[in-house]
């Protein structure tokens, strides 16, 4: 039940993000429209996609807390990943829309210099998102949630987007109104890049992709355990933010069942202690004599 308790605690991070994005997106879109800032409007649209992404994380965390059943013997942990994948599609659509609008403005003869209130709005948004980022990063490490850690990274990128918006609007005050539009275009690219990164990571996880470097680290741990004659096979995959490892090891044929079972327990203990892996399935085979 410990993992489910951690997922429950992680909900607060998603809720904080949702609240922050609701406030920021409304303020930025209104001020961006009233004071003629393409960059701030794009920043506000970016925050609306973040609302969707944060809601997806929240839904994923809640579904992931459902215990295993007949249809889902491994639990519902992948709900986090599926929700993130859906959010990436929505973010990509909004990012492309921002690029399209910015592109039209670049080739338009009508370009207005945004008011400085738009710049200060962007600066305030950057400060708020840095605070939310630090909160979610600490919480993500505490509850060991990759989805929440990704949300924290998104918070951080949003802070930098707002800083870029601030710089673009300030530069536009020096009779360079086109800089505000160019900044909006760059923000559109950043939204698309974030969407692609989330899609790439989520699809990699859903297709049972895994980091080879982590597999190598697991191998080193298991091969050092007393009683393990040979590590025959090892596979790992993500189920949401949890790692499941399947191990096949060869042990001396002279060992009895109890001794072999003790080795399996030691493998599970070391994997949890050194790599924070709670789910290890160990299969024992007698050492093949060559």
UniProtKB/Swiss-Prot annotation:
Keywords: Cell membrane, Ion transport, Membrane, Transmembrane, Transmembrane helix, Transport. It comes from the Bacteria. It is a multi-pass membrane protein. Disruption phenotype: Deletion of the gene has no significant effet. However, a mneP-mneS double mutant is manganese sensitive and accumulates high levels of intracellular manganese. Pfam families: Cation_efflux, ZT_dimer. Its main location: membrane. SUPFAM superfamilies: Cation efflux protein cytoplasmic domain-like, Cation efflux protein transmembrane domain-like. Belongs to the cation diffusion facilitator (CDF) transporter (TC 2.A.4) family. This is Manganese efflux system protein MneS. It comes from Bacillus subtilis (strain 168).
